[in-house]
């Protein structure tokens, strides 16, 4: 039986091409969704990063260790898409602490439809 392969499609130019961590996240997501991942060309400042099966997603890859790092990333992301992927591979705080901050933020009123986490071990966890 042949293994299905999925593509990461970049519809952009050099000026606004995806960063390396976004590309590696897209490869993980293509395998998770069993679908092609299309990087969307930025129309304005606040547009989602990718499209998977007609659903727009914003990828956030926080790097900090501060108390508000996760909260600030969610606040920025909600202006871009209702579906968020929080990539924890670059974050300086411990993964369990970051997960606790995500759970705390999502316990307050929000408008997100879907929230996924990419763990430091490249696994995807569905939160919402």
Which ranges hold each PLM region?
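Metal-dependent nuclease catalytic core centered on acidic motifs
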Residues: 1-36, 63-128
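Short, well-structured alpha-helical interface segments that form or flank functional binding sites
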Residues: 20, 24, 45, 54
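A short acidic/basic microdomain associated with nuclease active sites
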Residues: 30-49
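Short His-Asn-centered micro-motif
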Residues: 40-41, 59, 87-88
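Short, solvent-exposed polar/charged micro-motifs at secondary-structure junctions
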Residues: 47-52, 125-127
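Conserved catalytic cores of phosphodiester-cleaving nucleases, focusing on short active-site segments
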Residues: 50-63
